[in-house]
Amino acid sequence: MKKWATLLAGSACALSMLSAPSFAKDDKELVFMNWGPYINSEILEQFTDETGIKVIYSTYESNETLYAKLKTHNKGYDLVVPSTYFVSKMRDEGMLQKIDKTKLNNFANLDTNYLDKPYDPNNDYSIPHVVAITGLAVNTDMYDPEDFQSWADLWKPELEGQLMMMDDTREVFHIALRKLGYSGNTTNEKEIDEAYAELRKLMPNVLVFNSDNPGAPYMSGEVGLGMLWNGSAAAAQNEGLPIKLVFPKEGGIGWVDNFAISSGAVNVEAAHKMIDF
């Protein structure tokens, strides 16, 4: 966890189905499935150098993809990284196994503000990995940020075919719910139906959905307005792109992605070592 924190400081602390990989065959291999933009290859190389464990690495672009892959190939994936609400869903469906925190020397160093949350009391099944916020990204060479201080501003008809949205059902519904004045975490079916109707109105304005590398459409100039993670916005700014991240008046979308061990893991020991790395 210490080394993860060092390499993720710039992105986190600035707070499709893929074919299944070859699965681990012995205790010197770890099958690790993670979000696309999270990893630095140096970490995997360093982990292998220090532990002798080879990492078989694959990525996904949404929690739904992760869920479907584990439903299809639960046996063999060792370490995965679901978001908060999917931790509880996957736990309840028997897709995750308990984490042995006695094997995590760095657990005591974690920020207690992100521990023992309702989706996983006592962190029995998950360990916080990345904490961030999704806001409203504005390319200031293309748009005036003062015109985009609310999620509702994305519904302006003159924005047809101009927006980048996260490829994440929960996050996209969140902004529609907040536009309507509802909680982003509501379970009220009427409110969710209303949000769905709002999203249908928004769709003509959407050019692209991307959660695999959401900064890329901004970096390429394909879009200049839409949703973006704060870490991706910081990376774009570091490259000299005139991106301003606005936290709308209804609030940004806070989220936590978590290390978790699949119930079908072959190399549980290696998974613990990677979490603690």
In which residue ranges do the predicted regions lie?
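Early extracytoplasmic/lumenal segment of secretory-pathway proteins
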Residues: K25-K89
